[in-house]
Amino acid sequence: MMKVLVVVALLVTLISYSSSEGIDDLEADELLSLMANEQTRKECIPKHHECTSNKHGCCRGNFFKYKCQCTTVVTQDGEQTERCFCGTPPHHMAAELVVGFGKKIFG
């Protein structure tokens, strides 16, 4: 009977050790993923900054990702150029206003 208890204890120890190794591997993968997301976040274009050369690189705002909004600018020479900046579209501003108002009332 004592041998059975020792074998069971040994098996439980081995199983718990192997599962903890698997969890450590998952945590390491998760950490690498978070570091990659942080790097992407650092490289994104902040609100009100120019995004003419990278129209999909705007950062995230409080609730939504900023959108690259473009306008045509006419210089004094009569040349037309496109200038873009990261900003919040009107429908996103309205949604953020409603959510903020709801948080004040129910929050």
Curated annotation (Swiss-Prot):
GO terms for cellular component: extracellular region. GO terms for molecular function: toxin activity. Residues 21-41 form a propeptide. PROSITE patterns: SPIDER_CSTX. Disulfide bonds join 44-59, 51-68, 58-86, 70-84. It is found in: Secreted. Residues 1-20 form the signal peptide. Expressed by the venom gland. Its main location: secreted. Belongs to the neurotoxin 19 (CSTX) family. 04 (U1-Lctx) subfamily. This is U1-lycotoxin-Ls1q. It comes from Lycosa singoriensis (Wolf spider).
